[in-house]
Amino acid sequence: CGIHDGASAVLVMEENMALNNGFQPILRFLDSEVSGVLPNYPGESPIPAIQALIKRNQLTIEDIDLIEINEAFSSKIVACTKELSISYSRLNVSGGALTLGHPYGASGSIMITRLFYEVQRRKDIKYVLAAIGSGGGIGVAVLFEVVT
């Protein structure tokens, strides 16, 4: 991975608190998953996290309208799209880490921020998902529902 500078912040609060303080909720956190693969295959680490997350929430990959997967390496995206049958029209639609950078410690909130802005540009979006893998084989996925 290259080394990039960047920062991001995500404001998380109870829906009632947001409304009482003049904020309009956009994304509602539903669930998250942390899974692992053998450390020799870190590019595949988001796959079991995504699979477990959507199964536990009784969804399919087709139910997810927008997906962000951190692409520190292009082979990670190839493996994930092939194994999960993700169409490129729903994946990293605002550009991924190879295009925009991959600042360590900020990538997760950057992906969620991109999803936040993208759901405001589009109609009929119900579920969005972000996932990231680590060099040690750990994959993390998070699922949000769009607040209407």
Task: Label each region the model flagged.
Residues C1-T148:
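Claisen-condensing/thiolase-fold acyl-transfer catalytic domains that form or cleave C-C bonds
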